[in-house]
Curated annotation (Swiss-Prot):
Keywords: Membrane, Mitochondrion, Mitochondrion inner membrane, Transit peptide, Transmembrane, Transmembrane helix. It comes from the Eukaryota. It is found in: Mitochondrion inner membrane. This is MICOS complex subunit MIC27. Residues 188-198, 206-245 have a biased composition (Polar residues). Residues 187-272 are annotated as: Disordered. The keyword Mitochondrion applies. It comes from Gallus gallus (Chicken).
Length: 272
């Protein structure tokens, strides 16, 4: 019985030591964890580079199909709108012509008759001539008949066509003139460049000749005259007998007379 009590007392007394050792082991194990192992504190790579995602084969095929089909779809849209507008305009023109012909003015039929007769006359006149005359005679006579039947409209159309022809001729003239002036300017520039190069060569030759002549003249002058003779002739030394000493005389205006005046020199002493 006593042995059991002793064992229990020993076990109870050893419990704090066991807990302390277990806690120390846990602390030591927790300290061994590195920051890189934690998911929150992962360090970014030192050298980072942005790499664009390259498209795959399927994406490339879809993009090529889209580009090719887009061009054809655009052309089809343009053709569809052009045909649609033409059909709408032709339908509207037919409606207007039907309304106009349903109730025509009294002078319409005679005018149409004159125009048709003039066109047929042109065809008859040019039936045995060349192809150009077969086309020109009917067109000319029909335009003449239209201008006779509708003079006001003919004048307006003639003015508009004349302005267009004048503008076109002016543009062609300016284009030809610009080309001609460009050629002339190029030839002038070539001639000027040639003349400038020739003048530069002449100036260089003249300057070289002058420089050589100047060097020769300087060398000849140095050999002819010595420095001692030139110094003796230009700057002669004064002789000892002719030297004279002059006394210093101060200016009375610059002297300090104090409270006296220059007239009372005999009465007051002056400071120089």
């Amino acid at each position: 019985m006593a042995a059991k009590v002793a064992r229990l007392a020993a076990a109870a007394s050893s419990l704090p030591f066991v807990c302390a050792v277990y806690a120390e082991e846990k602390e030591s194990k927790s300290q061994l964890v590195k920051p890189k192992q934690l998911p929150i504190y992962c360090l970014p790579p030192l050298k980072s580079k942005y790499i664009e995602e390259q498209p795959g084969r399927l994406q490339k095929q879809f993009s090529s199909i889209r580009q090719t089909t887009g061009r054809y779809i655009g052309w089809c849209k343009d053709a569809f709108f052009f045909a649609k507008n033409g059909i709408v305009d032709s339908i509207q023109f037919g409606k207007d012509a039907y309304v106009y012909l349903k109730n025509p003015p009294p002078d319409f039929l005679p005018r149409v008759g004159i125009i048709t007769i003039s066109g047929l006359a042109g065809v008859v006149l040019a039936r045995k001539d060349s192809r150009f005359k077969k086309i020109a005679y009917p067109l000319g006579l029909t335009t003449l008949g239209i201008s006779v039947c509708y003079p006001a409209q003919a004048v307006v159309i003639a003015k508009i066509t004349g302005k267009k022809v004048i503008s076109a001729s002016h543009q062609t003239y300016e284009a030809v003139r610009s080309l001609w002036t460009k050629k002339e300017d190029a030839s002038k520039l070539q001639q000027e460049s040639k003349s400038v190069t020739q003048e530069n060569k002449k100036n260089r030759e003249i300057s070289n000749v002058q420089f050589e002549s100047a060097i020769e003249s300087r060398s000849s002058n140095r050999t002819e005259s010595s420095p001692i003779e030139s110094w003796s002739t230009k700057d002669p030394l004064p002789s000892s007998g002719t030297v004279k000493t002059t006394k210093f005389k101060p200016d009375p205006k610059l002297m300090d007379h104090g409270q006296s005046s220059p007239e009372d020199v005999d009465m007051y002493s002056t400071r120089s």
